[in-house]
Design a protein with these regions (language model features):
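Stable alpha-helical elements in mature extracytoplasmic
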Residues: 22-25, 80-84, 88, 128, ...
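A structural motif corresponding to the C-terminal end of an alpha-helix
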Residues: 40, 86-101, 131-148
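Mobile gating loops/cap/lid regions near enzyme active sites that modulate substrate access
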Residues: 112-126, 138-221
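Structural recognition of the beta-strand scaffold that forms the well-ordered cores
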Residues: 1-4, 45-51, 55-58, 93, ...
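Structured, solvent-exposed acidic/aromatic patches
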Residues: 79, 90, 94, 101-117
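Conserved SGNH/GDSL esterase-like catalytic core that processes O-acyl groups on lipids
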Residues: 1-82
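Serine-dependent acyl-ester chemistry module
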Residues: 56-75, 108-130, 156
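Extracellular/periplasmic catalytic domains that process cell-envelope and extracellular macromolecules
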Residues: 35-43, 47, 93-95, 142, ...
Length: 249
């Protein structure tokens, strides 16, 4: 699996941990030559594509900084959604994969990052994520890719958290203050990359009273381990629906 912090669909730019675009990641997979590892895709693979979240987040930040217009931002995320669909069709499906699941993005405006934003900002952020998803769906129309709507999945848990074992779906589990202390002031945004739930000091970065199992969000946009398990459980059910794994597993 590939997971690179800050990655966008086709733009490789500074920021994040290893911000190589999804397009470059797939190209590398298709052309790599590593002893003991195959390159490319085949019918034995189950391929998950869950990316693009940083495109609407980037555009929202640019609009907030008056570095672009709202109309240009919407157009940019539409382009990114279309580019992701093209990537899936031309570089994954056309290269041998037959079981490909593509995730729609969850509504970023409902994440803790925008909890303090005004209604207009939240509405615009929601518009950006919806525009990306619409372009992605349109671009994949007629292809064999299966769609997993992560937005609907997370909306369900926000609507009734207790039924899924969560006690908090609004606040972050990681403490920005503790992480700042742990990193000597090098990380001040509470990024979950630097958040450790292991008990005891000095490296536990959880907020007082928080739980990595029962809080949905670790930081402003990333799920906790409990959030990831919840998503994985839902995806496992989808794989059964698709007929990709036995229904009795």
């Amino acid at each position: 699996g590939y997971a690179q912090g800050g990655a966008r669909v086709t733009v490789s730019s500074p920021g994040g941990a290893l911000p190589i675009s999804l397009a470059d990641q797939v190209a590398s997979h298709n052309t790599r030559s590593v002893p003991g590892f195959k390159n490319g895709f085949d019918s034995g693979d189950i391929v998950f594509v869950f990316g693009g979240n940083n495109d609407p987040l980037t555009q929202a930040a640019l609009v907030g900084a008056a570095a672009t217009t709202p109309a240009a931002a919407v157009a940019a995320v539409q382009t990114a959604g279309t580019e992701l669909a093209t990537l899936v069709k031309n570089e994954i499906l056309a290269k041998g994969a037959t079981r490909v699941a593509v995730f729609l993005l969850p509504d970023g405006s409902a994440s803790p990052r925008f909890a303090a934003a005004d209604a207009q900002t939240k509405a615009f952020v929601a518009q950006l994520f919806a525009a990306f998803n619409t372009a992605l769906l349109t671009g994949l129309s007629g292809s064999s890719a299966q769609i997993i709507d992560s937005g609907a999945i997370f909306a369900a848990v926000r609507a009734n958290p207790g039924s899924f074992g969560f006690t908090n779906v609004d606040s972050v589990a990681c403490s920005a203050a503790k992480i700042s202390a742990i990193t000597g002031g090098q990380v001040t945004d509470g990024s979950s990359l630097f958040c450790n739930a292991s008990p005891g000091v000095p490296f536990n970065g959880l907020a007082t009273g928080a739980s990595a199992s029962t809080y949905l969000f670790a930081d402003g946009v990333h799920p906790t381990t409990g959030g990831h398990k919840f998503l994985a459980d839902q995806v496992w059910g989808k794989l059964k629906e698709f007929g990709w794994v036995p229904s009795n597993l």
